[in-house]
Amino acid sequence: MNLKFAVSVWSVLLVLRLAVFAMDPEKQAVIDRYKAPFAVYLTAINDLGSALGTVKTESELIKAADKFCDEANKFVDEFNANKEQFADSQVVKSMDDDPDSKKAMEDYMESLKSKLEDARPIFENLISSLNRHSDSREINRVRDRVAATFQRIQLLYM
């Protein structure tokens, strides 16, 4: 069973790599440019999950939440910069008509969607951890900051 799974995964990766090689380098560069901020965000989520697993004090929770917010806001800024840079790009517009580019983006977005769904327990853990602590000035500040960060991220989808 594990061998079949490994062969299947390898086959999918090979097909994706071949699709990338068939794509115009300019289009691939645009896709890579859009992927970069998401890599920052996914790393921030994973780091948050790891930190929450070891948090013992309120100050450690605050530090973990602040670090996540810093990185998540960096993601939003980089994403918006890319969006602005490529707003009127002919390369981006031509990608809608290119099956290889379209497929590469769809595959990446599906993978990203799955990773973000897998991260939901981390966010739930963060929120419940913040709610378990007293209403100190610092906890309230971090709650507000986390809420504002999530709101910024949500605006990307509109």
Label for each model-derived stretch:
Residues 21-73, 152-158:
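Immediate post-signal-peptide N-terminus of mature secreted/exported proteins
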Residues 68-138, 145:
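Long, amphipathic, charge-rich alpha-helical segments that form helical bundles/coiled-coils
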Residues 1, 24, 110-112:
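Short, low-complexity interaction segments enriched in Ser/Thr/Pro/Gly
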Residues 1-9:
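Bacterial N-terminal signal peptides that target proteins for export
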Residues 8-17:
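Bacterial N-terminal signal peptides
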Residues 140-158:
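C-terminal partner/receptor-binding element of secreted or periplasmic proteins
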